Amino acid sequence: MRRAWIVVLVVTLVTAGAVSAQTTLSAKWEELTAGDFREAIAKAQGTCLLPFGIIEKHGPHMPLGPDLLNVRYVTEHAVQQEYAVIFPAYYFGQIFEAKHEPGTVAYSPEIQLKLLQETTDEMARNGCKKVVIVNGHGGNESLLPYFAQTQLAKPHDYVVYVQWGHEATKKVGAEKSGPDYHAGESETSNMLMTNPNLVHMDRAKNESGADQKRVKLPENVYTGIWWYARFPYHYSGDGSAATKEQGEADVQSWINTVVRAIRAIKADDESLKLQNEFYEKSQHPLDTVK
């Protein structure tokens, strides 16, 4: 009799676990039913993440999508600590400097801005009144603040926030000299943490990631060809120096940073109020009181 009760208890616990797994509310937009989506927006307090990657060459040893893969890994783990809805894969950003490399997908400036605007508009129409663009691509660091600034051009009933980067972590192993901007030690370490099966460490030295220094200009002078002039192989640094341990430290720091950002944004009640105030005053600038 006792054995029978034990069997019943085990079956009950297993069944309960299966039901619990089935009823756990996903954070991924594309995995939610229409009914569950309504619940998810309420649980997220209208806060939704738009992880922003890119499709480009990453040295001779990594795939084309680390920026997208890593930022989605980070956001998917961050929302386990602070719930928010995650928009599906998005990679329609700025990558003109890599158009000469196989596999790069570079959309026109007009499409980049228009598609991003329509995407955030549609997110807001579906209840995302706080849209958090989590940037995973260095080439977007001018595009995204500019896009956020353009939200002041006309009224919106939602706020766009842009989050990128994380606090520096302690270096694991010896310090390496030279720039480490793209597909080098840092980014390769992150991939060894998030998607190690996609990294070919034996190929990391097949090309040079050294700065070629082909244009001599003052630091405060900018030209669009600067990246190609310095890193024509679209590789900056030394991927062979990467370690999973460094990746674990960096990725965890990134996750923690995104968690803090989500919490701060959920608590932010002022940005939308001030945005609406600004819209109103901008219609009557001569009435603005000093």
What is each PLM-predicted segment?
Residues 1-7:
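Bacterial N-terminal signal peptides that target proteins for export
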Residues 1, 16-21:
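Short, low-complexity disordered leader/linker segments with a strong preference
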Residues 7-16:
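Bacterial N-terminal signal peptides
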Residues 21-110, 114-130, 138-290:
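Extended, histidine- and acidic-residue-enriched regions that form the cofactor-binding/catalytic faces
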